[in-house]
């Protein structure tokens, strides 16, 4: 048999997930001129690009321009996209093992971390990711209903997602209507009764995880004042020492400078206001059948034995009336049947991207992880490029060492995922396309996605918008089929 990776015997790789980590992995794999690689990319949505489409704020179109790089990868010979295909529903992990030399799991962290406080499950208390998906037209969240009638909303968290949702609630209709915000969200946000958005940070200004541009934007809102009580900027000794040290992250130092400038501003009397609070943690959400208030505990900072600056409760309490609570305190992944998973950390266990058995720590040949499901929800979009290179280098090393597994015989019945094939079933000859067709999976090709894309852009043009997004899977499938029929 010709060498694996030759033109006669290309390396076959499946990538589960089509966000930045998945596309960077595909690009690193396919750009090697001395290696022949075929990549099949799977996503449970009909649309690719993951959080670039469904997570980046609609008023940040420049960030979304990275999609042009992914489009070049998708245009490479040997690349195929299988949208609207869910691993575990339409195809089992074992069936991917049978058809690919390597499977890269790049499906991100889909669930949010809980606050773990009383009242967290009251109507009106939501994960910030749910809110983000809702205004970004994610089809799973199109029918969500957010109560925006109360004058105050509270956002829990001090990272960029918290800044995004606070800013989106503060934007006026005229600005929303120049973006690709979902139509249903534009109407709800533009007509909301929210006048004040309070953003709570567990630790102090020096520990806030915002990037500098996100912080600056909060001070540039056309119809919302930015408010920080000067008392919030009274730093503890440990934070001052950190800011003055050579170890200080320049982002943290600049954030504190921006916060200090905000705290000196006099409110201009704009229609709304965004209030940043530090050393404040929610301890209870109250209400009779819905969110009516939130109890906030005051924290103090201390330096632990390892030199880390941590927060502890002082026992001081404050109650704020509100009608909406959005928590943005981190994310975790969910497991796939047949793939090792560390439920405590919410990650696929791995070493340098090689998936490992949870108990023994042994490498699982042919299985790899990349992105947030590999390392946790950290970094920006570009962080995934280096992360993907590390994982792909592990694949190359395994290929050169001869430890890449051969293609295995499929073990599942084409009619039903996860069931043993009947005796004598000729499942070896069933390609992934045939398998999906037998299951009735209505998969979307990259050509189909391009038709969806074109339809959205065309719909937005008369309104001066970059696109009007479909928010229903059946609408996406219909748009894709119109092109594939030509």
Label each residue range with its predicted role.
Residues 124-142, 285, 290, 302-375:
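FAD-site-proximal beta/loop scaffold in flavoenzymes
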Residues 38, 46-102, 251, 256-270, ...:
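N-terminal Rossmann-like dinucleotide/flavin-binding domain of flavoprotein oxidoreductases
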Residues 112-191, 348-357:
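Glycine-rich dinucleotide-binding loop and its adjacent helix/turn
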Residues 13-35, 163-169:
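N-terminal Rossmann-like FAD-binding beta1-loop-alpha1 element of flavoenzymes
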Residues 102, 106-113, 159-160, 322-335:
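Glycine-/small-residue-rich beta->alpha transition segments that form the dinucleotide
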Residues 37-38, 163, 167-316, 393-403, ...:
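Dinucleotide-binding/catalytic capping subdomain of oxidoreductase cores
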Residues 354-486:
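C-terminal, flexible cofactor-proximal segment of oxidoreductases
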Residues 69-124, 283-295:
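Feature captures the FAD/FMN-dependent oxidoreductase FAD-binding
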């Amino acid at each position: 048999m010709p060498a694996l990776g030759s033109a006669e015997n290309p390396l076959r790789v499946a990538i589960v997930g089509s966000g930045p980590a998945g596309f960077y992995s595909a690009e690193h794999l396919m750009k090697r001129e001395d290696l022949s690689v075929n990549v099949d990319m799977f996503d449970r949505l009909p649309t690719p690009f993951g959080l670039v489409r469904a997570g980046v704020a609609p008023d940040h179109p420049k960030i979304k321009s990275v999609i042009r790089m992914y489009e070049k990868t998708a245009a490479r010979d040997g690349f195929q996209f299988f949208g609207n295909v869910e691993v575990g529903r339409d195809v089992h992990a074992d069936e991917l093992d049978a058809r690919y030399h390597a499977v890269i799991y790049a499906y991100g962290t889909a669930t949010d971390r809980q606050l773990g406080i009383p009242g967290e499950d009251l109507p009106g208390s939501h994960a910030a990711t749910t809110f983000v998906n809702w205004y970004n037209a994610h089809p799973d969240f199109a029918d969500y209903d957010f109560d925006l009638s109360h004058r105050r909303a509270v956002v829990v968290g001090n990272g960029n997602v918290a800044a995004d949702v606070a800013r989106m609630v503060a934007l006026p209709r005229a600005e929303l209507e120049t973006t690709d915000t979902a139509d249903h969200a534009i109407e709800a946000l533009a007509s909301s009764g929210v006048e004040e958005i309070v953003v709570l940070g567990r630790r102090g200004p020096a520990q806030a995880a915002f990037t500098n541009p996100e912080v600056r934007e909060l001070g540039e809102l056309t119809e919302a004042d930015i408010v920080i009580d000067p008392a919030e900027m009274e730093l503890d000794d440990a934070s001052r020492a950190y800011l003055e040290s050579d170890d200080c992250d320049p982002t943290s130092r600049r954030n504190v400078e921006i916060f200090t400038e905000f705290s000196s501003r006099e409110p201009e009397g704009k229609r709304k206001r965004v209030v940043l609070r530090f050393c404040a943690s929610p301890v209870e959400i109250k209400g009779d059948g819905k969110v009516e208030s939130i109890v906030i505990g005051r924290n103090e900072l201390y330096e632990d034995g390892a030199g880390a600056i941590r927060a502890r409760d002082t026992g001081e309490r404050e109650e704020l009336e509100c009608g909406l609570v959005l928590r943005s305190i981190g994310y975790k992944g969910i497991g796939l049947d047949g793939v090792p998973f560390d439920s405590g950390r919410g990650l696929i266990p791995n070493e340098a991207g090689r998936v490992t058995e949870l108990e023994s720590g042994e490498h699982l040949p042919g299985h790899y992880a990349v992105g947030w499901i590999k390392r946790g929800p950290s970094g920006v979009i570009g962080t995934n490029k280096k992360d993907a290179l590390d994982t792909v280098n592990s694949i190359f090393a395994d290929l050169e060492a001869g430890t890449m597994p051969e293609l295995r015989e499929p073990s599942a019945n084409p009619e039903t995922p996860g069931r043993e094939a009947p005796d004598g079933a000729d499942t070896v000859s069933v390609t992934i396309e045939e398998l999906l067709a037998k299951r009735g999976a209505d998969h979307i090709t990259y050509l189909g996605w391009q038709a969806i894309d074109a339809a959205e852009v065309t719909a937005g043009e008369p309104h001066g918008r970059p696109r009007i997004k479909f928010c229903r899977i059946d609408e996406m499938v219909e748009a894709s089929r119109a092109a594939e029929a030509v």
